[in-house]
């Protein structure tokens, strides 16, 4: 038994009892080792105070995902018999959409609507200048079933699904894909993975000619980012915990290569557990707010979920051969708020770095946020590594609250920077998979988001074609 850990837990339990009895102030003064603490671990935080402002703020139309006309929505004609959901474009090093021999390329998750375990990465392409949903073509899956075995990688051989990621057009004209290797064989183990995708072009089509340099990069170090073994040791699925290590987004800065990804904090930068409920840094604002909100949280049915909530947008540096060079601190964390901040995205625009993530209200512990609420949250910094401050004062960028059964339900919102101007294109998928016989999950209509320093707003009447990536190009 770890005696130090046991003593710390006992102290927390004593303080919890005091708070529940309404004796918060007395507990603060009784013993120094029972006092709340403030520890940022040198990273930025999505605070409870900021999130509690969102239910009122989200009523403003400038944060609301536009309403779409369901009668105009089409399936992707080339993706016959497939649901298509999370997608990401082939991007240049600066985040703008790459021109690959006259084509735009998108990678997307797709699968059989009748088989929830069928999740693979497909490639789609359209000629530059075309925007119609019908102009998207596909050569099919990126990987053959045998590729994971041919790679001679001890982790890859146990992959059962392919999850979201990113893709970059390298300086030597290659396509480098990053994605999440998911293994259903090992309690949902997730590994950041990469491969070079070889694509040949003609005047009328693109073809996939196999992959090379296919390898695992990172699966958590336990100290900075939770790994699957910690999840298993603490009770795996029965514990109520939600282990994440996925959605790698590639970014370059000052000649260095990085991946930013969805994760959970590790033992040295604010791990999950009851002790986290007493860290003022996770609450924000003031000591008086902390006292009020922490007591309320401890008495609520969300306290167990809150103590397990330690979502993070993590960061690692890569070597030039795309192997792991350095594990870095998270750019931001969501301790006590949510365990799941997805689709990490970061880009530089007009001298500022913008960081965004998607999250579901059903995974949150914030009063006033409902299970149907869907968000894109955003943050801004003067440097890639932070510190990051919330856009629009709270971090709210986009909100959507349609019933998941609605044909025009959207998720996985992703900001695509443009070559010039203050607008980004927002892409997403529409219609949840397997819900309709005739309506497949598909590219949602894109729309514009305007960014002015620390403020954003949805551009009115800016709905674009389904899956459209660029404007004025």
Swiss-Prot record:
Keyword Secreted: yes
InterPro entries: Glyco_hydro_68 (IPR003469), Glyco_hydro_beta-prop_sf (IPR023296)
GO terms of biological process kind: carbohydrate utilization
Compartment(s) of residence: Secreted
Gene Ontology CC annotations of this record: extracellular region
Gene3D superfamilies cross-referenced by the UniProt entry: Glycosyl hydrolase domain, family 43 (2.115.10.20)
Family classification: Belongs to the glycosyl hydrolase 68 family.
Superkingdom to which the source organism belongs: Bacteria
Alphabetically ordered keywords of this record: Secreted, Signal
Annotated signal sequence range: 1-29
Protein name: Inactive levansucrase
Keyword Protease appears in the UniProt entry: no
Pfam family name, one: Glyco_hydro_68
A molecular function (GO) term: levansucrase activity
Major place of residence: secreted
């Amino acid at each position: 038994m770890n005696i130090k850990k046991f003593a710390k837990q006992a102290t927390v339990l004593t303080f919890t009892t005091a708070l529940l009895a309404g004796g918060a102030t007395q507990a603060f003064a009784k013993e120094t080792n029972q006092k709340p603490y403030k520890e940022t671990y040198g990273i930025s935080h999505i605070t409870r105070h900021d999130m509690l402002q969102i239910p009122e703020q989200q009523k403003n139309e400038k944060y609301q995902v536009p309403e779409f006309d369901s009668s105009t929505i089409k399936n992707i004609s080339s993706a016959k018999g497939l649901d298509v959901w999370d997608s990401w474009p082939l991007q240049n090093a600066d985040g703008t959409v790459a021109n690959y021999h006259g084509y735009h390329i998108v990678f997307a998750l797709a699968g059989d609507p009748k088989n929830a375990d069928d999740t693979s990465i497909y490639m789609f392409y359209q000629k530059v200048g075309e925007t119609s949903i019908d102009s998207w073509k596909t050569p099919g899956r990126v990987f053959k079933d045998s590729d994971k075995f041919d790679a001679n990688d001890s982790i890859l051989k146990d992959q059962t699904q392919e999850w979201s990621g990113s893709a970059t057009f390298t300086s030597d004209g290659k396509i480098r894909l990053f994605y999440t290797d998911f293994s259903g064989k090992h309690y949902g183990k997730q590994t950041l993975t990469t491969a070079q995708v070889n694509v040949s072009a003609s005047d009328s089509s693109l073809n996939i000619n196999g992959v090379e340099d296919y390898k695992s990069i990172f699966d958590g170090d336990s100290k900075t980012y939770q790994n699957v073994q910690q999840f298993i040791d603490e009770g795996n699925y029965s514990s109520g915990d939600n282990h994440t290590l996925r959605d790698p987004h590639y970014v370059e800065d000052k000649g260095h290569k990085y991946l930013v990804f969805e994760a959970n904090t590790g033992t040295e930068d604010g791990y999950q557990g009851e002790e986290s409920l007493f860290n003022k840094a996770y609450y924000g604002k003031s000591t008086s707010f902390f006292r009020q909100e922490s007591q309320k949280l401890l008495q609520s049915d969300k306290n167990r979920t809150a103590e397990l909530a330690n979502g993070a947008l993590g960061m690692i540096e890569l070597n030039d051969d795309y192997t792991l060079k350095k594990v870095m601190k998270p750019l931001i964390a969501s301790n006590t708020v949510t365990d799941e901040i997805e689709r990490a995205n970061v880009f530089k625009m007009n001298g500022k770095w913008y960081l965004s993530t998607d999250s579901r209200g059903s995974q949150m512990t914030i009063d006033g946020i409902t299970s149907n609420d869907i968000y894109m949250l955003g943050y801004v910094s003067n440097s890639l590594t932070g510190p990051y401050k919330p856009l629009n004062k709270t971090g709210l960028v986009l909100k959507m609250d349609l019933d998941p059964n609605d044909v025009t339900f959207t998720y996985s919102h992703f900001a695509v920077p443009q070559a010039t101007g203050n607008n980004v294109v927002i892409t997403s998928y529409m219609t949840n998979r397997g819900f309709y016989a005739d309506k497949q999950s598909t590219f949602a209509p894109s729309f514009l988001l305007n960014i002015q320093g620390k403020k954003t707003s949805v551009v009115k009447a800016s709905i674009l074609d389904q899956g459209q990536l660029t404007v004025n190009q």
